[in-house]
Amino acid sequence: MSLYDDLGVETSDSKTEGWSKNFKLLQSQLQVKKAALTQAKSQRTKQSTVLAPVIDLKRGGSSDDRQIVDTPPHVAAGLKDPVPSGFSAGEVLIPLADEYDPMFPNDYEKVVKRQREERQRQRELERQKEIEEREKRRKDRHEASGFARRPDPDSDEDEDYERERRKRSMGGAAIAPPTSLVEKDKELPRDFPYEEDSRPRSQSSKAAIPPPVYEEQDRPRSPTGPSNSFLANMGGTVAHKIMQKYGFREGQGLGKHEQGLSTALSVEKTSKRGGKIIVGDATEKDASKKSDSNPLTEILKCPTKVVLLRNMVGAGEVDEDLEVETKEECEKYGKVGKCVIFEIPGAPDDEAVRIFLEFERVESAIKAVVDLNGRYFGGRVVKACFYNLDKFRVLDLAEQV
């Protein structure tokens, strides 16, 4: 007895397991189909009967005159295409007469084309019907009704449509002139022929009417006088009236104090969508004020290691903790070497007390000046600047800054 006798030995069929099963199934199907065909042929030959020729024995005469009528063999009905008894009609092996064959042409394309044409025809009919209804509504809208030949009052929708169309076609509304100009217009004398033409005829007009265009020889002339050249330059009496409304008089200068304007007006932006008009001289003053109010750029031109702080405390407010607190506060900008507090007697309150801070690096001093200048401390605005290092070391602390 061997050591491996109890183990199953694999047969050679497992090696061809991937294709042998399908091949065996095909062979079995072919055998079944062949058996069905042979069985049907044998049954057809057994059940078909052939009758003998018919001989008419009643008629007299010789045997040569006898007529033999041959009739075709009679085949029993229903046995032409027998169905094998071993298979049902629903099995796959039985060939069907209407079985679908993808290689055989069918009417699918014709059916799809017919349905597409039908949908297109239906769509065209709906579109034509909609056009006819629209034309009918348009005719009914313009058609008059009643004895007075007035439009039908029930067509509210048509009236709304006409109203909207009228609003769209109408131009922008003109703004009525101010009442002050109208009042001054009434006060003007009647001996000016051009005044009557330029007067607004109706304030309720919906659209602005352009001025009439004249040839050079037909243009109305303004009256002769000392202000004729000015009126010609100002473009007519309308501009003259506007200037008079804002206080212009012949021979006087423009401006609040009649000083005249030597520079053009400028506009200063105050917000995202707002601004104000500034006279040229005022712009120069504002620019100088801005340069004076922000002298930080001037301070940073000559940096040193010594920072001078003014207006931190008033005269007589210096205590023992001020030096320590100031030094600790300025340690965040860099290492502070020395802190000195000096008070000038008889000086103004914002210049009386000076606090000097000596940093080890110039960069730390610059950070301190940028951060402390303009900062609020105890209700006061701190003034920070640089101080000469040599004068600080010899304790010359009262120099004018």
Swiss-Prot record:
What effect on the protein does mutating residue 376 to A have, as reported in its record?
Impairs interaction with SF3B1, SF1 and U2AF2. Abolishes regulation of alternative splicing
Q: Where is the composition biased (Basic and acidic residues)?
A: 57-68, 114-153, 182-200
Query: What does the annotation give as the result of altering residue 319 to K?
Result: Abolishes interaction with SF3B1, SF1 and U2AF2. Abolishes regulation of alternative splicing
Q: Where is this cross-link: Glycyl lysine isopeptide (Lys-Gly) (interchain with G-Cter in SUMO2)?
A: 15, 24, 33, 41, 58, 256, 276
Q: Which domain of life is it from?
A: Eukaryota
What are the transmembrane regions?
A: none
Ranges where the RRM domain occurs = 306-385
Q: Which SMART domains match?
A: G_patch, RRM_1
Which residues are reported to carry the modification Phosphoserine?
2, 155, 169, 222, 266, 291, 293
- Gene3D superfamilies reported in the protein's UniProt record: 3.30.70.330
The alphabetized list of GO BP terms reads: alternative mRNA splicing, via spliceosome; mRNA cis splicing, via spliceosome
**Region of interest called Disordered, as start-end residue ranges on this chain:** 57-84, 114-233
Q: Where in the cell is it found?
A: Nucleus
Per the entry, what this protein does is:
Splice factor that binds to the single-stranded 3'AG at the exon/intron border and promotes its utilization in the second catalytic step. Involved in the regulation of alternative splicing and the utilization of cryptic splice sites. Promotes the utilization of a cryptic splice site created by the beta-110 mutation in the HBB gene. The resulting frameshift leads to sickle cell anemia.
Oligomer status and interactors:
Binds SXL. Associates with the spliceosome. Interacts with SF3B1, SF1 and U2AF2.
Query: Know the name of this protein?
Result: Splicing factor 45
Recorded source organism is Homo sapiens (Human)
- Give the classification, highest ranks: Eukaryota, Metazoa, Chordata, Craniata, Vertebrata
Gene name, Swiss-Prot/TrEMBL? RBM17
